[in-house]
């Protein structure tokens, strides 16, 4: 807490001392301090669609112009989001490739040598990671992948004749949870709430983010698959296809909910700071007591 207070105090002094009229591209502490002092803030932010960016006006990456631009449209052509998804799929394929035995054997010695180089040169990077963690991390991730593969065996073809909502897990830590969604910080709690309140006969299909494998405990997955109305999709399942097949998509503030919204599919989020909440088929869970009715709305299509 002392470090956080010092960071805020530093930026407050800087803004006052230099009489700043605009703050750009700073972290959350800088943005929050500028906002409290009435100083405009701008940050070039990825739009999570193609290679587009926009200027966010606060630490929640908001921009009021998005809704205005949407309302000004006179026609709505079909959205083409496969190209944007292809970039993510390429990244996930690289990460899967990095977990192969031969890739570990090739990269681990290089990582160890680089670590000692940083230590000898007394660089900060040399103290940021313990050697034991560096050595065990690739094997820990492989073990986590094997455990997940034993639990996540369902494919979209298994759900072809079933009604389900789709919940893709988000990587943690991640700005879309820790920074833009202060209302809900626990994906585990969100999943339990959704599974509890889903209408009878509706399944909750969950898919892990490839980038997050090895970051969660084994018990996280064990507790999820123990829920009777939950199925775990195989990590290689194409998320965009799951969005299209599901009756609705649910995240805290993830990109999959935005993709569902673009495609005109019902979507639920747990953050009030999403950029598409003004759409008629996008709803925000502001109170857990309203979740049952929102899920009935979403499941009805």
Q: Where are the language model's segments positioned?
A:
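Conserved catalytic-core segment of nucleotide-activated headgroup transferases in glycan assembly
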Residues: 113-218
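N-terminal pre-catalytic "stem/leader" segment of glycosyltransferase-like enzymes
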Residues: 1-5, 17, 22-37, 163, ...
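Donor nucleotide-activated moiety binding/catalytic core segment of transferases
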Residues: 2-16, 179, 186, 210-256
